Amino acid sequence: MSFELLATDGKARRGRITFPRGTVETPAFMPVGTYGTVKGMLPRDIEAIGAEMILGNTFHLWLRPGTEVIKKHNGLHDFMQWKGPILTDSGGFQVFSLGAMRKIKEEGVTFASPVDGSKVFMGPEESMQVQRDLGSDVVMIFDECTPYPAEHDVARTSMELSLRWAQRSKNAHADNTAALFGIVQGGMYQDLRMRSLEGLENIGFDGLAIGGLSVGEPKHEMIKVLDYLPDQMPADKPRYLMGVGKPEDLVEGVRRGVDMFDCVMPTRNARNGHLFVDTGVIKIRNAFHRHDESPLDPTCDCYTCTNFSRAYLHHLDKCGEMLSSMLNTIHNLRHYQRLMAGLREAIQQGKLAAFVDAFYAKRGLPVPPLD
């Protein structure tokens, strides 16, 4: 993997990540394919909406169908028939999400499988082996996602454990030719975040991610971290904000120097009939769309908007048709890709401020200040 910085506008960066399987223009949004599929999307649909890289979930694929099945297909790419780069998360966040079902020790985490209730163990070495078996292009270290809220001592202990696991992840990654990303933890505490970053830089990674955000903290707490952290991360490596978020969050992350994003929001919201447009969100389930012959978004070039009316999308949603989720997902993911393309072009032209002004004006919102 190589990263090239092509342009900057303030803290915002326009770059390109090159993998043997293809290039990813940044800032980039990666659709989430938890079980080896982006829900409701064929691989050709994912390509058609402009996504260049997707995310796979190590934890869930390890439990189901199991790496022994995926290895027979020579890895996740052939298994799911996606030709572009894949980033796999380490499973740390999913283990964190299990709450009382898990027990964390120095060696790793023991938990009850959400599939069949059996006792399962995962540590850094296991996570690295699973990701090696999946054949992902970007491997994430195994870490503990610091909960919110957390007292300073709790956040410090969690961060220090994650650093030790980061070193073990690096050791276990060994001769794997895939890129390995570290994850900055430390909760909402700047001193802990900076210690985490320093420790990860000393270990040495191909890219760095910001973890432990969008875990229940207020928006202003997340922004506070983004105000200082990305700018302190190495300029010659990709910066990845994990699990975030809304279109506004992507814009604010880009303004502060983030290069990569992922989130289930566009796909999950699509299945609930919440569709993103430049002015905000359209709830296609609402009755007043029943007779609306206009496209969902006349400015959008996706298959959904160029072929179907709001009335048809409303009808499919009310009937619970499978096609409803599929068409909604195509639109939402294309909306996110168009947003990222607009941000890239604005940075390239040195016109990000004007782009951001227009973005918030369409939503009737003030532009948030930059620290």
Curated annotation (Swiss-Prot):
Enzyme Commission number: 2.4.2.29
Free-text cofactor note: Binds 1 zinc ion per subunit.
Residue numbers spanned by region RNA binding: 243-249, 267-271
Top enzyme category: transferase
Pathway: tRNA modification; tRNA-queuosine biosynthesis
Binding annotation for substrate: 89-93, 143, 185, 212
UniProt GO MF annotations: metal ion binding; tRNA-guanosine(34) queuine transglycosylase activity
Active-site residues per Swiss-Prot or TrEMBL entry: 89, 262
Gene Ontology biological-process entries: queuosine biosynthetic process; tRNA wobble guanine modification; tRNA-guanine transglycosylation
Obligatory cofactor(s): Zn(2+)
Keyword entries, A-Z: Glycosyltransferase, Metal-binding, Queuosine biosynthesis, Transferase, tRNA processing, Zinc
Reaction(s) catalysed (UniProt annotation): 7-aminomethyl-7-carbaguanine + guanosine(34) in tRNA = 7-aminomethyl-7-carbaguanosine(34) in tRNA + guanine
Binding residues annotated for Zn(2+), in chain numbering: 300, 302, 305, 331
Disulfide bonds: none
InterPro entries noted in UniProt: ArchSynthase1/Queuine_TRR, TGT, TGT-like_sf, tRNA_ribo_trans-like
GO cellular component terms given for this protein: cytosol
NCBIfam families: Q_tRNA_tgt, tgt_general
Binding partners and assembly: Homodimer. Within each dimer, one monomer is responsible for RNA recognition and catalysis, while the other monomer binds to the replacement base PreQ1.
Function: Catalyzes the base-exchange of a guanine (G) residue with the queuine precursor 7-aminomethyl-7-deazaguanine (PreQ1) at position 34 (anticodon wobble position) in tRNAs with GU(N) anticodons (tRNA-Asp, -Asn, -His and -Tyr). Catalysis occurs through a double-displacement mechanism. The nucleophile active site attacks the C1' of nucleotide 34 to detach the guanine base from the RNA, forming a covalent enzyme-RNA intermediate. The proton acceptor active site deprotonates the incoming PreQ1, allowing a nucleophilic attack on the C1' of the ribose to form the product.
Family indicated by similarity: Belongs to the queuine tRNA-ribosyltransferase family.
Stated name of the protein: Queuine tRNA-ribosyltransferase
Gene: tgt
